[in-house]
Every structure is written in C-alpha cells, then in structure tokens.
Curated annotation (Swiss-Prot):
Enzymatic reactions: ATP + H2O + cellular proteinSide 1 = ADP + phosphate + cellular proteinSide 2
Protein name as it appears in the record: Protein translocase subunit SecA
HAMAP family (alphabetical): SecA
Organism from which the protein derives: Neisseria meningitidis serogroup B (strain ATCC BAA-335 / MC58)
GO terms for MF: ATP binding; metal ion binding; protein-exporting ATPase activity
Source organism phylogeny: Bacteria, Pseudomonadati, Pseudomonadota, Betaproteobacteria, Neisseriales
Keywords on record: ATP-binding, Cell inner membrane, Cell membrane, Cytoplasm, Membrane, Metal-binding, Nucleotide-binding, Protein transport, Translocase, Translocation, Transport, Zinc
SMART domains from the UniProt entry: SecA_DEAD, SecA_PP_bind
E.C. number(s) listed in UniProt: 7.4.2.8
C-alpha cells in the first residue's frame, strides 16, 4: 500500500524515465525543420561529420539529438516513414542498453534504426538479432535503403552461408542475423586453426528483436557444435522394447515401476522399477546375473533406459515433434515452429527415433557449446525490444542487468479483453469456441484462434470443417505458407487457426495486408504490365471498403483455446489485435481438462466448480477462478525462472573455463612468436614430472627414479641415466635434475628447429597446440556434462550440489590444463624430423614427403594436416621470398586461395601466405 501511495506522489520509475526521455525528444523535434531544409548531399554528409566528431573525443550521447534527427529525416525521404515521438523514446531506450516494451504494430523495426545508426557511427559494428532467417532478410531488405543513404553498409547472416560471405557480412557497419547464427559463428570462430578464418569482429552492440523469446524462452537451450560419437545404435532399438513392459504409477506413491512428473518434465524409476528393469535386461543378455544398473560398468545401459522412458512418456508426436521425410523434427513449444537441424541431446533424439521406427542417427559428442544467456552477456552493450517484457522484467534485470521500459502507444489501445470462460470439459469448450467463431464470421469479423499445440489446431480445424466454416491453419506443418496466411488474417470474415503466435513477425492489418497482395501480383510472371496495373488499382480501391467493413464489425477478434504456462505468451496472442489504435477484442476459453488447470489449479478450482455446478455447455465466469488461474501461471513462471537461473549458475562455471580456453586459443592464433610459451610449457611439464617421482622435501629413499626414467623415455624420447647422476654427485637434488633435463630437452628442440626453420616449426607448434587444446576441451566438456547430470545426488549426503559442482569442476579444469600442457610437450618433444631430398619438385608428390615421424600411435590423428606445414620448407630449398611484399615487388599477384608459387601444391594462405 505504501508503495502505491509513493507511486502516486512521485510517479513510478518508468514514469520518471519517460519524463527524462521526453526532454530529449523536444531537442530532436527542434532540429526537424533544420534537417528538412538540407539537401540530400548535405544530409548524407552528416554521417562523416558525426564520425569525425566522435574521433575528436565527443560521445555518442553528445551527438544523439542530431543523429536521431538525421535518421528520422533520412527515413522520411527513403522509406516514406517518419518516426513518431514514442518511437524516438524507444530508440533512446535501446541506445541506453535497456529493453523497450512496445505493443504490436508500434513499429519496432523502425525504432531500431535510430539506435543502430547512432551506434554504427563508432565503427565497431552493430548486430540486429531476429528469431529466424526470414525476418533477418526481410528487415535488412526494408531498412538497407535508409542505411545506404546515410553511408552505412548492411550485411545479413543466414544459415548455409559460406565463411567468406559471412566475413563480408560481419565487416559491414550493421549486420542482421538470427540468434542461432550469431552464437554458432562465435563457437566456430573459437575452433579455427587460422586467425584469418574467423568471421566475427568484436561483440560490440546488439539489438535483440523479440528479446523475451530469445533471452527467456530459449535461455535453457544451449547452442552446441557436435561431432558423431562412437555409439551403439542397436542398443536404442533394444531399449525401445523395455518401456512397454514397465508399469506407470498413477501417483508418486502408487504402485508401479516409474512415475512421470509432468511439472518437472522428468521420469523417476521406483525401487521396484529398478528391479523389474534389471530382470528384463538380464533376460535380454544385456546385464549379468545379480549385476546392478548402478554399477560403473552399466552407466551406458542406465542412460539408454532413461532416454527410452522419457521418449515414451514425455515426448508426443504432433506436440513435441513431427515426422517429416523420415526424420524427427522438433517443434518449438513456444512458437509452434519446426526447428529443422536441431536435435535433443543425451540420447533422447535417438530414443524418439527408435520409438517412431525411423532411421536412428548416431548420438553426438559436444565439441563446443554456450547458452544464449552467456553468449549475449559477451556484448559490450546489449538491448532489446518486444511487445511483452514487463512480466519478465525481474529476470531481465537480475540475469542480464537489462532494465525494462514500457513505451506508451502512439494511439490509445481500443481492444476489449473479455473475461475467461471456463467449462467442465474440453468438448464443451471447443463447442463454445466454434459457436463464437460462427457468430463473428456471420458479421464479417476476422478471427484468430490461438492453440498451444499442433494437435489442438488440427482438432479446431476439424470442428470448423464440420461446421462448414472456411478457414486457414497456421502451425509448424504449414511453415511455408506462414507469411501469406498471416497477411490475410485481417480480411472480412477470415478465420485463422494458429499455434502460438510468438515471434511470427508479421502484423495483421485489418482488411488484409495490401502490400503482400500487390507484391504477389507484381511477382506473377503470367500477367502483362497492363494487367498487373489494372489488378493493383482494383485491389487498392476495394481494400479501403473492406478495411472499413472490418472496423465496423469490431476489428480482429482473438480466441485463446487455453492458457499458456506464461502470461507473456497469452499477452502476445492478445497483442495481435488492436494495433495502432484499431478496434479489436479477445477472449480465452478454458476447461478443467487443460494441462495448466489440471496440474496447478485443480484442487481449489474443482471445489469452486462443485459449488457453482453449471449445466452442460454453460460457462463459468468468476473473478476467484481468474485469480486462481493467474496464480497458477505465476507459480509456473517462478518455477521456470528458478530453472533458468539454476542452468545459468551451473553454466557460469563452465563459462569461466570457456573464457580461459578461448583466450588461450586466441593468443596462440594471433601471436607471431610462441617460442616463449612453448619453453614455459616444457619447463612446467618436466618440473611437474620430476616432482611426482622426486617429491620436494622428501628423503632420497622415497624417490622413484626408475619410473621417472621410463616416463621420460616413453613420453619425451629422453633417455637419461639419472641413477648415474645421483651416484656421481651426492649433493644433487630434484631442482638440479630439473635443470639438467630441461637443458637437454631445450638443446634437442633447438636442433630440430634449426633443421626445419624457426618459422616452419612455429607454425607446426601452433597447429599441434590448437589440436591438443580442442581434443582435451572436447573430452572435458563430456566429463563436465556427466558431472552435471549426477551432481544432484550429493544432496542425499547432506552436501550442496552447486558447491560440490564448482569444487569438482575447478579440480577437473586444473587437470585439463595440466593435461593440455603435458600432451603438447610430449608430442612436440618426441617428434623426429627426417630430411628427404627433393630432386625434382614437379615429380615429387606431396604424399611422399614424410617430414614427421612418431612412435606414438595416435600421432597421425592428433597432427592431421600439420604434417604439410613443413612441406613449404622442402619446396623452397633456395630460400626464395614468397611473402606478399616480395611478390608485389616482383609484380606477381597471388590471392589467398591461389596455389602457392613455391610449387608445394598447397593454397597460398596455407603455405607461404600463412608464414607471412
């Protein structure tokens, strides 16, 4: 109560921010006439002027009013769109690194141009992040004329682009792309073995469209680059036969083999279930008699069994996935879109493939991963925009340090939001939905019906067909027709059935989207120019009449067939109606069979229902019920927030390790001379090895000299008689032995370097180091994943799982780092160089030049392409200079992908171009 009184007296934080922004709006508006008076050339020259002022020390905030005024005027001239005052406020909110909540239809795409233009002037690049390739290409195409007019370049990142094209797109002043593409490019950049293969620049400023969808809904979905692991595919098929033999428990304490916790989306085997599963697996010959699923040797069996149980109990066709072209394609639970190319991890995808009888593809091993939470926190400045952020404002603030500012609408919202209607059964609910649609259709009012699953959208479609009502269905299966269906959803009497509308990205215009219709006519190659003009003219004449008719009928009517777990998704559905002051209405139809009511509000709601006891087909409308449902939604939102926060807390541990590894990789990639680093690694490894078998401050009797000598011979090809050193000099200690061994290793290494050349050896070292780091990091990620999966069991021993995870992860990372150094030192020290004469270069195939030999059995696998790095020396015995500078001086033009002129057969960038 005191908070409400304070808000009335002083205004809310949001009110105070808007008041400050309006002062800046007044300054921008005061410059409008001045900008309108400028010629195109003078207006365009402002960009160069701003860049110079920034170079002279002025800040972006200092030039903001002028830059916004220039962008607004340029937009008016190139796009025919002038920014409203509230859009100027939105632009300032984005520039300040905050989230702008703007209603559907308020022009978020245009708002972004203000902050994007201003921040692009700094020359460090700006990323505009969208939810799919279509929106990235569309928004970039619409706004490119504006940016080009102002002297800025625009790039677009879409899937399947080649690295060279990606480099060009990232080099542009402004880069559009999806959250997935930006994230995967970051991971790929940290896997390259040549710094020139990187595509991204520094992560400077990002504007995230539909920020709640990306930073909230997808926060728990990590980006993973993976490779195929060695896996027994037949085991998935065998395990798929086990779940039908196990009995599902009706309640958590009931009889049976396993309990399905729908709230937590988990399957828990009971004690009896473990015994039953062990009996079945023993009969199948997969488990030895009296053996346990919990023994270390049977971890893989337990992993496959739980994956099969989850596939059968929690993942359902046409709700969580569809089968398309013989493959399992995941359905996004928030947007209803197909997520082609994505696969569930931990063997779940293979278990679902086995359940559905489609081809089982091998389980993947993680090579690199990052969550969106940690990726977007890498940007120097981050901002976002959406129509629904206020309900998640606390999460944005606590996790991303992003404040949410609610931007007022340009025109007052005219939409009427009716109370929910609640029915006893789903059958009664859908009957009422069809009746409401029928009434709207009769008066010409367009209707958008929102469902939470493909299954429900197809059920509604079936009922509408039976009622003789024409309609369009928009769900994951109709992805190709999506834009066309949405564009016409506002026509007179149109009925559109859609899975969740989150992130659809296309406004529903009353009377139909005229631009989409005229574009379709212009693209029709069967029509002549005269026919096209005639059809467009007729369309434009008829559109206004249709628009007016829809307005009179009440605008777009939204029908929700059930409440989503998140109020935000419900608000997104409602927000499709009433854009820019248009009339509209919305109503949700619920039943006590809906998952939300069944799982979270059943007890009290059932008691209320029994008291009211309506007849069949009669709806209940009661404030207490509405509050009960909203309370259930808040409960789910709170639980989901806790889960996302927990994911972040665990991922933060891996994130710190990731930063160290990627920083070290980058240092190796970019350093011209890594000899000091190599020397330090060799010294550390030898010191650690000596300390292991000759512990400091220990007696000589405790030393294990024979094992030390064997390890030195096996790992470093260093055959030294340390026993004789000790006999010859009684005063010798561990430190003296370290110094002698390091001196021997350094002398041998210097001889090898002299043999092949310093630069060639440096490149060889760099490749080996990178490959060792990548291999060891990959194994570490798998170990961290296994640790994470089982760490919750520590709570049974009265230990804090998070603290235990941090402690063990730290120990594992120390072991990782020591292992990396040991493998690098061992491989590079044990390498032998063989000189093979090259009499006639043209007749000597590269494959016959054996530059490196190793007794280590996995040397070939670890080194891979590194063997060819020494070829450059063999093909250039007279030391001819093939550097870019020398070639240019001789008038030779050699591009990076051309064959090297030395005759090695390698590309220039992999040969002397790389050495340069």
């Amino acid at each position: 109560m005191l908070t409400n009184i304070a808000k009335k007296i002083f205004g809310s934080r949001n009110d105070r921010l808007l008041k400050q922004y309006r002062k800046s709006v007044a300054r921008i508006n005061a410059l409008e006439e001045q900008m309108q008076a400028l010629s195109d050339a003078d207006l365009q020259a402002k960009t160069a002027e701003f860049k110079q002022r920034l170079a002279d020390g002025q800040t972006l905030d200092g030039i903001l009013p002028e830059a916004f005024a220039v962008c607004r005027e340029a937009s008016r001239r190139t796009l025919g769109m002038r920014h409203f005052d509230v859009q100027l406020i939105g632009g300032m909110v984005l520039h300040d690194g905050k989230i702008a909540e703007m209603r559907t239809g308020e022009g978020k795409t245009l708002v972004a141009t203000l902050a994007v233009y201003l921040n692009a002037l700094a020359g460090k690049g700006v990323h505009v992040v969208t939810v799919n390739d279509y929106l990235a290409s569309r928004d970039a195409g619409i706004m490119e004329p504006l940016y080009n007019f102002l002297g800025l370049t625009v790039g677009v990142i879409i899937s399947d682009m080649q690295p060279f094209d990606r480099q060009n797109a990232y080099a542009a002043d402004i880069t559009y792309g999806t959250n997935n593409e930006f994230g995967f490019d970051y991971l790929r950049d940290n896997m390259v073995t040549d710094q020139y293969d990187k595509v991204q620049r520094e992560l400077n400023f990002a504007v995230v469209d539909e920020v709640d969808s990306i930073l909230i809904d997808e926060a728990r979905t990590p980006l993973i680059i993976s490779g195929q692991a060695d896996d027994n595919i037949q085991l998935y098929q065998i395990m798929n036969t086990v779940p039908p033999h196990l009995v599902r428990q009706e309640t958590e304490e009931g009889e049976g083999d396993y309990w399905v916790d729908e709230k937590a989306h988990q399957v828990i085997l009971s004690e009896a279930g473990h015994e039953h599963a062990e009996q079945i697996l023993t009969q199948m010959g997969l488990l030895a008699e009296n053996d346990s699923l919990y023994s270390a040797a049977n971890i893989a069996l337990m992993h496959h069994l739980m994956a099969a149980l989850r596939a059968h109990s929690l993942f359902h066709k046409d709700q969580h996935y569809v089968i398309q072209d013989g493959e399992i394609v995941i359905v996004d639970e928030f947007t209803g879109r197909l997520m082609s190319g994505r696969r569930w991890s931990e063997g779940l995808h293979q278990a679902v493939e086995a359940k559905e009888g489609v081809e089982i593809k091998r389980e993947n091993q993680t090579l690199a991963s990052i969550t969106f939470q940690n990726y977007f926190r890498l940007y120097t400045k981050l901002s976002g925009m959406t129509g629904t952020a206020d309900t998640e404002a606390f999460e944005f603030q606590s996790i991303y340090n992003l404040e949410t500012v609610i931007i007022p609408t340009n025109r007052p919202v005219q939409r009427k939001d009716f109370n929910d209607q609640i029915f006893r059964s789903a059958e009664e609910k859908f009957e009422a939905v069809v009746k409401d649609i029928e009434e709207c259709h009769k008066r010409g009012q367009p209707v958008l019906v929102g469902t939470t699953s493909i299954e429900n959208s197809e059920l509604v479609s079936k009922l509408l067909t039976q009622a003789g009502l024409p309609h369009n269905v928009l769900n994951a299966k109709e992805h190709e027709r999506e834009a066309l269906i949405v564009a016409q959803a506002g026509k007179v009497g149109a009925i559109t059935v859609a899975t969740n509308m989150a992130g659809r990205g296309t406004d529903i215009v009353l009377g139909g989207n005229l631009k989409h219709q005229t574009d379709a006519i212009r693209a029709d190659e069967t029509l002549s120019d005269e026919e096209k003009q005639a059809q467009i003219a007729a369309l434009e004449d008829g559109w206004q009449a249709e628009h007016d008719k829809v307005m009179e009928a009440g605008g777009l009517h939204i029908i929700g067939t059930e409440r989503h777990e998140s109020r935000r998704i419900d608000n997104q559905l409602r927000g499709r109606s009433g854009r820019q002051g248009d009339p509209g209405s919305s109503r949700f139809y619920l039943s006590f069979e809906d998952p939300l009511l069944r799982l979270f509000a059943l007890d009290r709601a059932a008691a209320i229902l029994n008291r009211l006891a309506p007849e069949r087909g009669v709806a209940i409308e009661h404030n207490l019920l509405t509050r009960q449902i909203e309370g259930a939604q808040r409960k789910v939102e709170g639980r989901n927030f806790d889960m996302r926060k927990q994911v972040l807390e665990y991922d933060d541990v891996a994130n710190e390790q990731r930063k160290v590894i990627y920083s070290q990789r980058n240092e190796i990639l970019t350093s011209k001379d890594i000899s000091d680093l190599m020397q330090e690694i060799r010294s550390d490894v030898v010191s650690d090895l000596v300390d292991t078998y000759m512990p400091p401050d220990s007696m000589e009797e405790q030393w294990d000299i024979p094992t030390l000598e064997n390890r030195l011979a096996a790992e470093f090809r260093l055959h030294e008689d340390i026993q004789s050193w000790l006999k010859a000099d009684n005063a010798i200690d561990g430190q003296d032995i370290k110094e002698r061994l390091i001196e021997r290793i350094e002398n041998e290494y210097a001889a090898k370097t002299e043999l092949v050349g310093k630069q060639a050896m440096a490149d060889f070292e760099r490749n080996v180091m990178l490959q060792v780091i990548d291999n060891q990091w990959r194994e570490h990620l798998a170990a961290m994943d296994y640790l994470r999966q089982g760490i919750h069991l520590r709570s049974y021993a009265q230990k804090n799982p998070k603290q235990e995870y941090k402690r063990e992860a730290f120990t594992m990372f120390q072991d990782l780092w020591n292992g990396i150094k040991f493998h690098i030192a061992s491989l590079l020290t044990s390498v032998q160089i063989e000189q093979n004469p090259v009499a006639v270069v043209e007749e000597q195939p590269i494959g016959n030049i054996q530059s490196i030999h190793s007794e280590s059995p996995d040397m070939e696998e670890l080194l891979g392409q590194s063997q060819t790095d020494l070829v450059t020396e063999a093909f250039n015995p007279d030391g001819t200079d093939f550097s870019p500078e020398a070639l240019e001086a001789r008038g030779q033009i050699v591009h990076r992908n051309d064959p090297c002129p030395c005759g090695s057969g390698l590309k220039y960038k992999q040969c002397h171009g790389k050495l340069a």
